Amino acid sequence: MAKNQKQTYISPKKFMQTKARTLPIGKCYVNDGWEENGFAIVVVTRIRPSGNLVYGQFLVDTYCLGVKDAFFVENMDAFDFEDAIDKLDSSYQMVEFPYVEAHNLIYGAIAFAEEAGIKPCQDYAFARYVLEEDTDGIPLIEYEYGHKGKYFL
């Protein structure tokens, strides 16, 4: 940084809105067996220049509610990331998941829920910035939503 320049503070929410999508996608995970039980825990990361990660976690109800819970950490080190994945893995058997599949699973569940008038949880408003925008630039993968073709609470 040049002399006499101060580093400006940017809030975590502002960082997510303005910077997160400029970073490369990192590893993504989902709980094994999500197709059978109607809920998925999806983790999406982006890699910061420092090597730390932007971490987004989404609880996705594929039967009805879409994104039930979401949160982000805008600057997570490797130790905390491994710890988070290990904790999830001990309960949910997490497996690596290609980003394009994570993207389609989350946005598809949101679209399905919105057809029933259900919006994503409030925290999705900022956690969503760990995802790419839902555009034609991301190949479309169709998943089945609902239980036996119907909304299921």
List each language-model region with its residue ranges:
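Non-catalytic terminal/accessory regions
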Residues: 2-153
